[in-house]
Amino acid sequence: MIRTLLLSALVAGALSCGYPTYEVEDDVSRVVGGQEATPNTWPWQVSLQVLSSGRWRHNCGGSLVANNWVLTAAHCLSNYQTYRVLLGAHSLSNPGAGSAAVQVSKLVVHQRWNSQNVGNGYDIALIKLASPVTLSKNIQTACLPPAGTILPRNYVCYVTGWGLLQTNGNSPDTLRQGRLLVVDYATCSSASWWGSSVKSSMVCAGGDGVTSSCNGDSGGPLNCRASNGQWQVHGIVSFGSSLGCNYPRKPSVFTRVSNYIDWINSVMARN
């Protein structure tokens, strides 16, 4: 019981998470076409990397939610790959002092995830690190929102990651950020937007044809600032349009984290 309560406090944001050492620059930068983020402004952002031909390569993003747990998307994971997590990095080629590369001890994918039906939802997973990381100005835990929280239309959030700078484009070496406005569920699920592909367990953001997430951003956070100034991870990058990363009326779609708080707590408590 004590362990469960402690984990609940952590993911609810009670342990000084969500306040980066360096202030986020509030501009209209974007991931697609991209603006470089200021180093260490998103200290819970991680690079999930796979071992390929003897080298570690960026595969997906993720968010550190405890000193030994990372939150990411289920579609990022496979039982046939070897993973590690890079934390505290701004440049992937030169992570520098203050970064840490940690092996993975366990992958926990939501039991209802179906890789053949992404639109069904449940695109969420937790990664247990082989050893806890030391928190610092470069490496901090993310805050998660209270269970059931629904963001209003046009709420300002940021997507972050090392995804492609444009559809079929190059991958950046340094972390990017993109300012996105939340699209309410009624609009996003309408026929001229995403239709029935979007469920109420998801969050839509963007859709202006300019700013979006892209391949390589998957699993990373949708960061939204609460009224008290605390940054919370409200979404996990899940999917976008096959027509292009920044196609009009096809906003980036995220797993809505507030729908899975109980699941997150349960997994962390059991493992």
From Swiss-Prot:
Q: In which tissues is it expressed?
A: Highly expressed in pancreas (at mRNA and protein levels). Also expressed in adrenal gland and small intestine.
Against Pfam families, the record matches this protein to: Trypsin
InterPro entries under this entry? Peptidase_S1_Elastase_sf, Peptidase_S1_PA, Peptidase_S1_PA_chymotrypsin, Peptidase_S1A, Trypsin_dom, TRYPSIN_HIS, TRYPSIN_SER
> Which residues, if any, are the signal sequence?
1-16
Q: Which GO terms describe its biological process?
A: establishment of skin barrier; insulin catabolic process; proteolysis; regulation of insulin secretion; regulation of platelet aggregation; response to insulin
The record lists its disulfide bonds as C60-C76, C157-C224, C188-C204, C214-C245
Q: Quick check: keyword Protease in the entry?
A: yes
Annotated coiled-coil segments of the chain:
none
In this entry the propeptide is located at 17-30
Indicate the segments forming the Peptidase S1 domain, all copies.
Answer: 31-269
Q: Which UniProt keywords apply?
A: Disulfide bond, Hydrolase, Protease, Secreted, Serine protease, Signal, Zymogen
Alphabetically, the GO molecular function entries are: endopeptidase activity; serine hydrolase activity; serine-type endopeptidase activity
Q: Where in the cell is it found?
A: Secreted
Q: What is its main location?
A: secreted
Can you tell which superkingdom this protein's organism belongs to?
Eukaryota
Active-site feature positions: H75, D123, S218
Q: How does it assemble?
A: Interacts with CPA1. Interacts with SERPINA1.
Q: PANTHER family of this UniProt entry?
A: CHYMOTRYPSIN-LIKE ELASTASE FAMILY MEMBER, CHYMOTRYPSIN-LIKE ELASTASE FAMILY MEMBER 2B
UniProt lists the family membership as follows: Belongs to the peptidase S1 family. Elastase subfamily.
Function summary:
Elastase that enhances insulin signaling and might have a physiologic role in cellular glucose metabolism. Circulates in plasma and reduces platelet hyperactivation, triggers both insulin secretion and degradation, and increases insulin sensitivity.
Give the protein name, as stated in the record. Answer: Chymotrypsin-like elastase family member 2A
Organism equals: Mus musculus (Mouse)
What broad taxonomic lineage does this protein's source fall under? Eukaryota, Metazoa, Chordata, Craniata, Vertebrata
